[in-house]
Amino acid sequence: MRLLQVEKGGGFFQALLIRFISMVSGMRLPDAARIVMYHQDFYGKPMTGWTQAAMRGESNWSVGERELFAALTAKWNSCTFCVKAHTAIASLALDKTLVDAAVEDFRQAKLSSKVKAILVFLEIFAKTPDELTAEHVLTVLHEGMTQQEVEDAMAVVTLFSITVRLADALNFAIPDDGDFSRSAPRMLEKGYVFGKSKLLGHPDHRALAEALRKRVLEGPGTMDIALRQAMAKRAAGGPAVGEAAYDDLARQIGLAAYKITDEQVKKVMQKTGNEKAAFELIVAAAVGAGLYRWEKGLSMLKEAHELS
């Protein structure tokens, strides 16, 4: 990873825990787990809380379908780590041949008309949110979906629009296919939190999204709140950030995180003076890009409701 503190653990206990989990599991603890263990109160806790609720909580979309949504979000963002991870999990919950075909080209795969319809919508939501309209929402509603089903699917893609940007900005190490296969059963069964998780009723995605936004963009941190908010807005296509190194990285996180270079992250670390500060700015940009899509989707849901 580009931030060694995140890779090794933010303190003695975290470093020890990472080594212990790696030893017990027989494989290197994936970077997706390391990132939510680091600076937990800032990012890990609100992010894993919403992710667990969206991916394993109550929904008319099956767990396998939600994992497929995550895999395709990763594909639409060219994130190799997340494509492999979520394809492996989805393949345990659904037919592997079907999952592989859907990841290759969901329009040609033998998916239900309902799943294909939501994927057409989600692709626009993920890749070109400014092109999303109420008509797109009405189209999927006419396929028999409820507004709640649309919101549930949007929550998955919002979360993984954040995760894929962090995976590529921080340059997650990519395990071999065997390690992805070994970790997939645990992920399918337990989900996105360590230990036990109680999920009661349908997730309140709007409240969970707001909790994430407030913590990352308004809560205490090493970096100034105004700068974190500026990074978030820039990643969502907003105005330039005053410092060139910050602006360059935030813009790239928003547009195509897989193109980020070591040098871009290094410049931000040099400017901030420490890895935790750089981590906060990278997270702020990724969260800004994801929540921009979420808010756009909610706006179109509201407009579609008023039109229907």
Predicted regions and their residues:
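Hydrophobic alpha-helical segments
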Residues: 1-308
